């Protein structure tokens, strides 16, 4: 729990986002140990863009979580091949990118990868989004922070139809599924 507070102190974007309930007695210590082992045993060798090892690990965990959740997973996870296709069709090299139901932030992550892979400048786009689910909104905040992607996801989770966090936004690209 102290580690989470320390991370939030160093990264203001994550303030009040990270869970701080790992010290509770009912937490399955064996399961927590398995998660720690999973991260401990990851090969930290260079595979192309080595700075994204943690991001790729997070994406892998999201996909496995989505697999376990079955049909409900569509609420926060879109398969990367679908997201990649959307981004390649739109080619968001510069401007404002908006995802009104951003889930875990996959559209923004893929947009950043697309720009980097094509020699573009990630600082030429601005990412905007929101999500109604509080847990999913926090997952997006963490996903983007891990990857160093700046985005305005609103000050809190909110439903786009009933509480638009970006009512004045004039987006150049809108990505949603």
Label for each model-derived stretch:
Residues 1-93, 152-160, 165:
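Non-catalytic, mostly N-terminal accessory regions of nucleic-acid modification and defense proteins
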Residues 72-176:
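Conserved S-adenosyl-L-methionine
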